[in-house]
Amino acid sequence: MAELGLNEHHQNEVINYMRFARSKRGLRLKTVDSCFQDLKESRLVEETFTIDEVSEVLNGLQAVVHSEVESELINTAYTNVLLLRQLFAQAEKWYLKLQTDISELENRELLEQVAEFEKAEITSSNKKPILDVTKPKLAPLNEGGTAELLNKEILRLQEENEKLKSRLKTVEIQATNALDEKSKLEKALQDLQLDQGNQKDFIKAQDLSNLENTVAALKSEFQKTLNDKTENQKSLEENLATAKHDLLRVQEQLHMAEKELEKKFQQTAAYRNMKEILTKKNDQIKDLRKRLAQYEPED
């Protein structure tokens, strides 16, 4: 039997939809056939017709067939929308975002593959004995219990992750400002020392001692300011390290939540999509750690 690359459960769902569509298509074709049959019985009673009479008959038949085909195409489009709505509603319960590729709907190779699949399914169903078995309806997703707790935990971790990102951004700004101010103070001190060296040859001997004392006092004051800034920088670096530890803790909790989710719905279609989301989260965390490394002061 031809395959569509789906698991057994989803393939059975596709078969059920194709049977439904085939049934609707058959009913509509019977309606079109009846239009022609009614025309034969009601209008084709004379042996000869004029050109005007033939045109009138064909125009009337065209209008009826056009209406029937248009109605079926519209109904088919609405039916497909309802089917997509069911799938999207189930995905949203697991906080998933599904995507569709409209261009694939006109892929001739894939369309032929679906046609072969339908032919194989019809052949297979004709060989199977007809059993009076009522197919169970799709059970709604469980909104309570372990699944609900896991979803709430994921939301909490995501919120905490956003808070940590905001906190890290604030610490980064503070650290950058502190480094800039420290650089400015060091440059000012160097300029003052350079200016002192340039002026030593031009000042009188009796004023040299006073100037050196003034420079020493200024240097002491600058050094004190630099020490204060250094302590402030150390505090910011400690906050940065704490934030990193918190980020690692959140990453570990996200990893644990991912494992719990994998155990919970490892047999469902949502498993692959959820795993992709968690992988993207870990990639975002890795990217954030790389960005943090750029702001760490060099030894």
Swiss-Prot record:
Alphabetized UniProt keyword annotations: Coiled coil, Cytoplasm
Coiled-coil residue spans: 96-296
Chief place where the protein resides: cytoplasm
GO biological process, one term: negative regulation of protein localization to cilium
InterPro entries: LZTFL1
Protein location: Cytoplasm
Cellular component per GO, a single term: cytoplasm
One Pfam family linked to the record: Leu_zip
Chain segments carrying region Interaction with BSS9: 145-299
Function field: Regulates ciliary localization of the BBSome complex. Together with the BBSome complex, controls SMO ciliary trafficking and contributes to the sonic hedgehog (SHH) pathway regulation. May play a role in neurite outgrowth. May have tumor suppressor function.
Similarity field: Belongs to the LZTFL1 family.
Quaternary data: Self-associates. Interacts with BBS9; the interaction mediates the association of LZTL1 with the BBsome complex and regulates BBSome ciliary trafficking.
Protein's name in the database: Leucine zipper transcription factor-like protein 1
Organism from which the protein derives: Pongo abelii (Sumatran orangutan)
